[in-house]
From Swiss-Prot:
Keywords: Cell cycle, Chromosome, Chromosome partition, Meiosis, Metal-binding, Nucleus, Repeat, Zinc, Zinc-finger. Residues 80-131 are annotated as: Disordered. Gene3D superfamilies: Classic Zinc Finger. GO terms for cellular component: autosome; nucleus. A zinc finger (C2H2-type) spans 33-56, 608-630, 634-657. Changing residue 207 to L: In strain: C1674, Md106, Md199, NewC, Sim and W501. This is Protein teflon. It comes from Drosophila simulans (Fruit fly). GO terms for biological process: male meiosis chromosome separation; male meiosis I.
């Protein structure tokens, strides 16, 4: 290279001048050209040369402008030309090889005719042949042009979709062979059909497998008979008739039987003895037929029997022709006792008015009940000969009352109806002692119920007690927050009537009026669902912040945004319940009516505002799910995001806050 430069510099035609240097940056892997005249850097050689021609031509003394091009520009021009030539050649080849062949034959024929015309004299026969050849050539050209037009029209009308459902078109000329493009289209169609058939078969196989799996997973029908693996024991099979309808459960009036009516058992036993020819039935397991004695039959037969006799039911009594549905009580022995004439004072129905009066009187002195239990705790534990009360869980309750030793009488009473259905209950008392005991027992019982706000005397689990305490603590906390606004009656109407003095009531009313006047200004909060387009959560949070600031300033309290959101949710839920579900307008107290007048501007539809974030919910289910998400263990202090597990929290710290 140095020799070549020396040769150029030695000649008079070429003059070399140093205009710049090559600069290399190793960090960026870049090469640049440094201009000595203006001290600029250029990354490309064509730019550097154009810069020299335009700005430094006076120093370098260019004799003529040199056209400086990059290698890429030169190559791109050559590639475009080559591409255009290839396209033109492709079009010419696709127009049809047959036409070129015919043209070549025509040209040969014409050349031959010309040569013949030049060399030899013209004959009439040759002239006629040449005219026929020319006519044939023109006809073939016309036919080829029409065929080309038809092919173009067919290509334009062909659908672009990949479906090959139509019938294949037959070629007009059987001798004409298929072109390359037609062969390609046929191969594509054939391969696509094969692939689609494979996919179709695969789908059908999957459907068949799913149907077989569903048939295998179906449960057994109830009519299907299972194989019996154990031997059948005929003694254990009950002889009940399943076609007969079930008998209704006897009412209380049918089961309350006097002891004098049991004399009818004598007649029943004699009837069983007379029936010796009756067909025998197999014995039932734990089922003994018993006779149902109504109260009317007991009153008819009570006067005729006065002798104490004891009858034992024999095994023949169980041989009955008709199958009956047995009750859980088994009668093994019947004792016929003397008729009892009880005074009217001992059997009295309990009125609801007396119970309500007793409830009111029992609440006057609650401390007396505790003193009675502390002074003599064994006072309420009487002997079993005087009184015995047994209760069992479930709808059937058996009450056995045994009187004193002077006139021993056994009373068995079956109660089938539940405590909710029975309106009038019968109370059986033997003498004055048991009467006084029952009154004391009921009074202490009612006092305990009133003190604990319970309905049934049941043993409660410690978990239930803790839940009740937590609910009470939550209601107390909400009441304290509502007192700051003057609306404790929303949680409980009895708070203002019982717990507050008249002076405190006046102050509460004044504070409630102030809060309603302030709350009425913020239309976008209490009428969120009717605003269209709906307001954004950021805008609502700003409004709630302004509401809390104004309430704290005017009412001289220290409430947070979460407290204000909780108050708004409680007011909206209370207002919705009054007008829709739980409370009737006719039975509302004066305090509730007063608060309704204050919040008469509120609509029935409302929205739930989350205490811990700016989210707003219309449905209650979504709101409760969202509250559960806040009750988690890990929370980011920077972006206030919540995480259920420690791993998610640590991953968030690594990615979001490195």
């Amino acid at each position: 290279m140095s020799k070549f430069l020396d040769m150029l510099s030695g000649s008079q035609c070429v003059s070399l001048e140093k205009c710049g240097d090559v600069v290399v940056s190793t960090n960026d892997c870049m090469i640049a050209l440094y201009c000595h005249f203006c001290r600029d850097l250029f990354t490309q050689l064509p730019e550097f040369l154009r810069h020299l021609q335009s700005n430094h031509s006076d120093v370098l003394h260019f004799t003529k402008e040199h056209n400086v091009y990059s290698v890429e520009e030169l190559l791109s021009g050559e590639q475009d030309k080559a591409h255009e030539d290839a396209q033109s050649a492709g079009h010419n080849s696709s127009s049809g090889d047959s036409r070129s062949l015919m043209n070549s034959e025509d040209s040969r024929a014409i050349d031959g005719s010309e040569e013949n015309s030049d060399n030899s004299p013209v004959k009439p026969e040759q002239i006629g042949k040449q005219n026929e050849i020319n006519l044939l050539a023109e006809v073939t050209n016309i036919l080829l042009q029409t065929n080309d037009k038809e092919e173009r029209i067919n290509d334009e009308l062909k659908p672009e979709s990949g479906e090959f459902k139509g019938a294949r078109k037959k070629a007009n000329n059987e001798s004409s062979s298929l072109k390359i493009c037609d062969l390609k289209s046929h191969t594509i169609a054939r391969t696509s059909r094969k692939r689609m058939s494979l996919v179709k078969n695969h789908i059908l196989r999957v459907f068949d497998r799913d149907l077989i799996a569903k048939l295998e997973m179906k449960p057994l029908e109830p009519d299907s008979k299972l194989p019996i693996t154990e031997p059948i024991q005929e003694d254990n099979i009950p002889g009940t008739c399943f076609q007969t309808p079930p008998k209704p459960i006897p009412s209380l009036s049918q089961l309350s039987v006097r002891k004098s009516s049991l004399t009818e058992a004598n007649h029943i036993c004699t009837k069983y003895d007379t029936k010796k020819t009756a067909p025998t039935m197999p014995k039932l397991l734990n089922n003994v037929p018993k006779s149902i004695l109504t109260s009317q039959q007991a009153q008819v037969n009570s006067d005729s029997s006065e002798i104490n006799e004891t009858y034992h039911i024999s095994e023949a009594a169980s041989q009955v022709t008709k199958t009956t549905k047995s009750f859980p009580v088994q009668i093994n022995q019947i004792e016929i006792l003397q008729p009892l004439k009880l005074p009217k004072t001992l059997i009295t129905p309990i009125n609801e008015e007396g119970v309500s009066d007793q409830m009111e009187n029992s609440t006057k002195n609650i401390n007396n009940a505790q003193s009675l239990l502390k002074e003599n705790p064994k006072k309420f534990l009487k002997k079993p000969s005087e009184l015995e009360i047994k209760t069992k869980g479930g709808p059937n309750k058996f009450l056995n009352v045994i009187k004193s030793k002077a006139d021993p009488i056994i009373v068995k009473r079956v109660q089938t109806t539940s405590a909710k259905d029975s309106t009038n209950k019968i109370q059986i008392r033997s003498n004055d002692k048991t009467k006084g005991f029952a009154s004391e027992f009921n009074s202490t019982k009612i006092r305990k119920l009133k003190m604990e706000n319970c309905v049934d005397l049941k043993t409660e689990d410690p978990c239930d007690n803790t839940n009740m305490r937590l609910n009470k603590m939550a209601t107390i906390g909400s009441c304290e927050i509502l007192k700051a606004v003057g609306l404790p009656a929303i949680t409980d109407n009895a708070i203002e009537a019982i717990m507050l003095l008249p002076d405190e009531l006046e102050t509460m009313r004044i504070r409630a009026d102030q809060f309603t006047k302030i709350y009425k200004k913020y239309y976008s909060i209490w009428n969120y669902r009717k605003i269209f387009p709906p307001a954004k959560p950021d805008f609502i949070s700003q409004k709630i912040f302004a509401l809390t600031r104004e309430v704290n300033k005017t009412m001289l309290c220290n409430l947070a945004n979460s407290d204000i959101k909780g108050i708004i949710n409680q007011i909206s839920v209370w207002h919705y319940n009054i007008y829709t579900q739980y409370i009737e307008l006719d039975n509302i107290s004066e305090i509730a009516r007063y608060t309704l007048k204050l919040f008469s501007f509120l609509p029935v539809s409302f929205a739930y505002f989350c205490k811990w974030c700016d989210d707003i919910f219309i449905l209650k289910k979504e709101y409760l799910k969202h509250l559960i998400s806040h009750q988690v263990r890990f929370q980011c202090t920077k972006c206030i995001k919540v995480f259920k597990y420690k791993g998610y929290y640590e991953k968030h710290l690594r990615n979001a806050h490195p």
